[in-house]
Amino acid sequence: MAKHQFQTEANQILNLMIHSLYSNKEIFIRELVSNASDALDKLNMLVLTNDEYKGVNFSPRIDIIADKEAKTLTIKDSGIGMNEEDLMNNLGTIAKSGTKAFLENLSGDQKKDSHLIGQFGVGFYASFMVAHKVEVTTKKAATEQAYLWISKGDGEFEIEKTTRESHGTTIVMHLNDDESEFLDSYRIEGIIKKYSNHIPFAIFMDKDKFIPAKKDEDGKEIEPSRNEVENIQINRANALWTISKNEISDEEYKDFYSSIAHSSEEPLAWMHNKAEGAIEYTTLFYIPSKAPMDMYRVDYQTGIKLYINRVFITDDEKELMPTYLRFLRGVIDSKDLPLNVSREILQSNAVMAKIKNASVKKVLSELAKMAKRDAKKYDDFFTQFGNVLKEGLYSDYGNRENILELLKFNTINSDEKIMIEEFIKNVDETKKEIYYITGKTSLSMLKSSPALERFKSRGINVLVLNEEIDTIIFPMVTEYKEYKLIHVNDVKFEENENDKKAQEKSSKEFEGLTKELKESLGDSVKSVEVTFDLVDSPVKLKEDKEDPAFMMAQIMKQMGQSGDTPAPAPILQINPKHELIIKLKNSADINLINDAAHLLLDQAKLFDGVQLEDTAGFVLRLNRVIAKAI
């Protein structure tokens, strides 16, 4: 038996891999099954294309054998196998992969058809995370000699000649004492279903089967119950997403959703797409019928599983799809995705970026089709996921217009939500302006906002956005196509000379009252001024967007830290035509003016969805004013 040293500083690399490279030990099974799948793929390719292998029997199969007494776990395949040179090159050199070298020798259609997974040569060594000794018996197809490779993961390995009936590879792992969980058939089956359920070859394993006792007609036991060992297939060996969608029934789609989403509820919809060209990939995305419980948590669990040639790579990579589509469940599978050395963390690469960008556009396109074809289903979707979708207006500038077209809006002219394309049908084409109002309050309260009175009086429709996210997102959305989006507080209507003169006159007449109100309110307001935008309400609040404090508050809000920054004092605007304001102007009762000032400010705050800090004071003032009025 010849002893050899691992190349490329093996001790250091083995130690790193065993203790640091993988975050969970169970994936050693994934790696070895992936290697077995590669070996079967290679042989299949050679049998089909190479005369030297024409007579080789190709009966693809992977077996997993757990021996609890011997404390060994065996993974066996009927693939291409290895000769001594292959063992030296592929198992003697870390970070060199026979599969990768094999890929380099392929071209054209052969490369497309080779479902080769192991692009890096470290997966095999993951076995040393759980085993103190690994034995590999292998025989290359179309050769006579078999070889035994043995290592304890200590920097050395041995190779000797041996015998083996058929081509293929058998890996026997002598497990560490604390790794007995990997001898449990149910644990192994769970790992296979999680990581390797969809590789193209069947995986078999012995499982205990309980045979109940047989009884005669009188109930007397004639044959005792017993356990029998049954060799069964434990993976599907057929990736649903690789099948033409015309050949998949709705029930099959729903069953697959249940298995990947771990949900008993049916999905709301699904999208199955196969892309061919410079980059080949397949996606199968589902929209759940209900929002995931953790959808608004920072540590939400992504629902997209990444496969490379049907082998599960990760379901914990949030960069696979943008966060505003985090409600999606499903798979991305590609032959063209390069992965880093551990296969657990995706490289930042152009291929993944292209797959992601194209997938996002496809999802948005499918949602747009749903909105047109099935309004009820889309309403259900938007009820569950509309607010999450809005996040894309901020985070995905390139798709902002498409996302806007998917949103549904409340308006002051309708009780039904409408899409933006429907809304702009009634927009003044000479101005091309879309007006909106935001506020963290109820829809009915926001629709009654004093800030909308001048629009209602002119018959102008306005988008009413009463979700908290709207106050953060929409100030950053300034246009849609050729239309400008403008907050109602920033709209200035044209006025004739007579109106301007009348307003100047009123402003001077109410200078005394504005001064008294400001003195009563102090720093609660930045200033008090007359406005001619109001019709039925006595007052409203206005933000001073030139105020540095306002600008800082907006920046902190966009950063998600609005709670750390005090809101800048607003401007209180009064309606000079309102009976209450006129009476206050003519009143000499300082106490009444003081109480009214605070009540009017609180009233304006309530309309804007601001909680009152001094509810008791509000009630006391209200009672005093009512008492004087009776």
Swiss-Prot record:
Residues covered by region (B): 344-554
In residue numbers, the region (C) covers: 555-630
Region span, A: 1-343
Keywords, alphabetical? ATP-binding, Chaperone, Cytoplasm, Nucleotide-binding, Stress response
Give an example GO molecular function.
ATP binding
Q: Name one GO cellular component term.
A: cytoplasm
Cellular compartments annotated: Cytoplasm
What is the similarity comment for this entry?
A: Belongs to the heat shock protein 90 family.
Q: What does the subunit comment say?
A: Homodimer.
Under PANTHER family, the record lists: HEAT SHOCK PROTEIN 90 FAMILY MEMBER
Q: What is this protein called?
A: Chaperone protein HtpG
